[in-house]
Amino acid sequence: MAFVFARPVCSTPAASRLGKWLKIASGLLLFSAYTAITTSCGLPAQSANLSAAGASSKLSSFEFANHGWGGHIRVSVSLPPATVGNAYNAVVSVSGGTTPYQFSVVSGSLPIGLSLNPSAGTISGIPVTAGTYKFTVQVVDAAGLSDEKRFMLSVAAAPVAPAVSVQISPLSPTVSSGTAKQFNATVSNTSDTAVTWSTTAGAISTSGVFSAPDVSVASTATVIARSVADPTKAASTTVTITVSSPVVPPQSTGFDGPAELPRVYVQSAMTDTPAPGNIITVNAGGSLQNALNAANCGDTILLQAGATFAGVFTFPAKSCDDNHWIVVRTSAPDSVLPPEGTRITPCYAGNISLPGRPAFNCSAAQNVMARIAIPSSGVGPLVFASGANHYRLIGLEVTRPVGGIVYSLISLAKGVTADHLVFDRMWLHGTPQDETTKGIQLGGSRYVAVVDSFFTDFHCTSMTGACTDALAIGGGAGDLPMGPYKIVNNFLESSGENILFGGAEATFAPSDIEVRHNHMFKPLIWMKGQPGFVGGPTGDPFIVKNLFELKNAQRVLFEGNIMENSWGGFSQHGYGLVLTPKNQADWNSTGNLCPMCLVTDVTIRYSTISHVAAGLAIANILSSNGGAPRDGQRYSIHDITVDDIDGAKYNGPGIFAMLAMTADVPVLQNVLIDHVTAFPPHTFLGVGNYTSGLQMVNISLNNSISAAGVYPVWSTGGATNCAYYDKPLITFNACFNRYSFAHNAIIGSSSNYPPSLWPPSTFFPPNASAAQFVDYKNGNGGDYHLLPSSPYKNAGTDGKDLGADVDAILVKIADAY
C-alpha cells in the first residue's frame, strides 16, 4: 500500500530516505517506496509505499518511529486533577520541534478560573466550579510544526471543612435554689475556643458560673454556650433547680471582729437523738448489714461488745426524722463507757497505751467496744448511701487489717448526700505502718457531729500517687451543700492535715463549722531520726503537712483547741495552722477543680500551738497550674499562744505568721491578729505580695507579745515583693492599704531594727525577762501570764494585758489533753 504525507506548512524536508520499520498495532509495515510531490510553498511532499507484514492486514493505529523529516513535535497526554479553591499550576508538556512554542485552546474551554499561558504553556489559576472539562490545546513550534491534544481535566469540589462544634458540661445537673454551679465549654475545629454564656433563668458569668434563681417550686433553666468563632454553633443543657431545704433559724449568730460566726450549730446531745423503737441485737457472727436493712426509724442496733464484725457495711436511706433516729452502738451499757461529753480512749478497746501518744490515764484496759473492720484494702468499713439520715453511732472501734491502702474508714458514697449523722465516743484507727488516708470523709453531708472520739494512725508515705495526704477528718469537696459540722472534744491524729476542708473539686463551700476542744497531735516518733522512729513498711517517713487547714470553708469557729507537733521536709514547712483558699489542681497538676472555693469568716481563738516549725500561714495564691480561688478574707485570730517554734528542730522557717498574696487572686483583706503570745526564733512576720501594685487591705496586728526573731519582718522572697527591703515600717506601708500595728511588745529586736523602723506605740523589751512572764521556760510550755509588775500589764488598746488571755485559754482547753 502507499501513503502520501503532505506537510501542512512550509519547512525544509529531511533529505534522508524513509525506510524504517513502523510499529503497527497488528503487525509491521515496511516502507517499500516513497514518492515526493510538490506543495504550494514549493517544497516536496513525500509519500511511502507500505507493505504489511504479519498475520493481519488490519491497521487500527500506528505511529511513525521516524516520519522522515528532520524533527517532530508531540504534546503530553494528560494533566493532573484540580480542586475548587486550590491554586492550580500545570504545564502542557511538549517534546520535539523547535522552540519557542505557541499554545492555544482550539476547541472546548478551560475550567472557569484557569487560563492558558500562550508562550509558557502553563495552565494556572484557582478553579471555581467543580466538573469535568474537555478542551483541545494546539502547539506550534518556531519551524511551523504543530500538534494538538484533547484533554479532559477533572475539577473536584472543595473539601468541606469540619464544622465548629460546641460541647457543654456538666449535662443536666441539679442545683439548689440560690446556689452556684460551674459550667465548662469545649469548642472544636477552630483556634478560637471562646464562648459567650447565656441562661434563660438566673444569671451566668462570663466564665460560666451559673447562679440559680431563688425558687419556691422546682423549675428548670437552660444554660447556653455559643461559639464566638461561629455564632451559629452552640450547645445547651437543662439545669434542674430544686427548692432549698429550709434553713434552721440561727441558734447563735454574730461576729468576732471582722469574721461572722456560724449561723447554725449541730445539736448532738443524746436527748437530741431519740430512738424510742425496738432493740435489735447482733451477736458475734451475726449480720450487721441485715440489721441495718431491717431497722426501722427509732430502732437501736446493739453490736456485741468485744466482737469483730468484718465487711463493708452500707447505711441505707430511710424516712427518719428528728424524733426517730437509728442508733448503732456497742452492747456494753452506758455505765462502762465514759459519760456523754467525755472523750473515749483506746483503753475501752483493751489498749492501755500507744507508743508516742499522750498517756490515756485509764486505771485498767477493758474491751467494751464493738469492733468493725474492713477485711482488705479499699474504702470502708462504713459507707453511707445516698439519702442516709438520722444515724447515731456510739462506742464502736472502726479499723482495718494490715497490708494495702485503705482510703476512708467512714465515708459517703461518691456524689451523694447524707444528713443528721452523729459519731459519738468512737475509736477510728489505721495500722502503725500502713497507708490509711482518712478517718471520716464528710463528702456532701449536712448536720454531722463528731464528738468525744479518738483517731490514730492515719498516714501516707507517697509524695505522689494514691496516698499523699492523710486526714483524720476531711470535707469540703463535691457538688452538694455541706454543713453545718460539729467537731468537738476529739483526739485527732494524722500525718497530713489533722483536719482539712477543701483540696478537691467543689462547687459549694462547707458552711457553719464548729471545731472546739480538740487535741490535734502528730507523734514525734513519726519524725525520721527520732528515737523509736516509725514509718511505712519500707522505712519511708510519713508525709507531714500541718495540723489544721482550710482551703474551702466559710463561717468557721475554731476555739479551745490544743495543737501539737508539725514539721517540714515535704511539700509544706511545718505550720500549725493554714488558711489558703485554693482552686485546687489534682495530684498530676491538671484542671482547676474549684473556682468556687473560698475561705471566709474564720474565727480562731483561745487555743494553743506548740512544737512546730512555724505558726500561721495566711495566703491567697494561685494553684500549681494557675487557678484562682473565689475569695479569702475576714479572719479573726486572737488569744492564742504559739510556743516552741523551732525551725532547726522541726525543719522549717521558724516564723510566727506569714501573710502572702499573688497576682490574679482576690485581695487578702480584713485580717485581725490580736492578743497573741508567740516566740519565733527567726521572724515575727513574713510578708509576700507579688501583685504589681495591689496591696493587702485592712490588716491589723495589735496587743501582742512576740519574740522579734533574727529578722523581725521579712520578705518571703523575690525582687518584686513589696517586702523586699525587709524593714517593718517600709514593708507595712508598701504591702498594706489601711493597717494597724499598735501596742505590740517585740522582744529582743536587734539594733538593726531600731524603733524608728517600727510604727509608733510599739514596745521593745530587750529580752523575755523584761516582759515579766510568770514562768517563761524559754518559750516552751511556760506560764505566759504577766506578772503584776510587768510594764505590759493593762497596756493594750483595750486596757487588757498584752498577749493572749491565758486564763480564758485555760478555761477553753480544760481537759482537752
PLM segments and residue spans:
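Bacterial Sec-dependent N-terminal signal peptides
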Residues: 31-72, 157-160, 244-247
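Short glycine/proline-centered coil/turn motifs in the loop regions
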Residues: 95-99, 108, 188-191, 200-202, ...
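Strand-loop-strand motifs at the edges of beta-sheets in extracellular beta-sandwich domains
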Residues: 110-128, 136, 204-215
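Acidic Gly/Asp/Thr-rich repetitive segments characteristic of extracellular carbohydrate-active
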Residues: 179, 184, 267-309, 314, ...
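Acidic, glycine- and Ser/Thr-rich low-complexity intrinsically disordered tracts
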Residues: 247-278, 342-359, 363-367, 538, ...
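Beta-solenoid repeat scaffold
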Residues: 270-274, 297-304, 310-371, 385-394, ...
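Extracellular beta-strand/beta-solenoid scaffold signature
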Residues: 323-326, 367-384, 404-414, 432-443, ...
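Right-handed parallel beta-helix
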Residues: 325, 389-400, 417-431, 446-461, ...
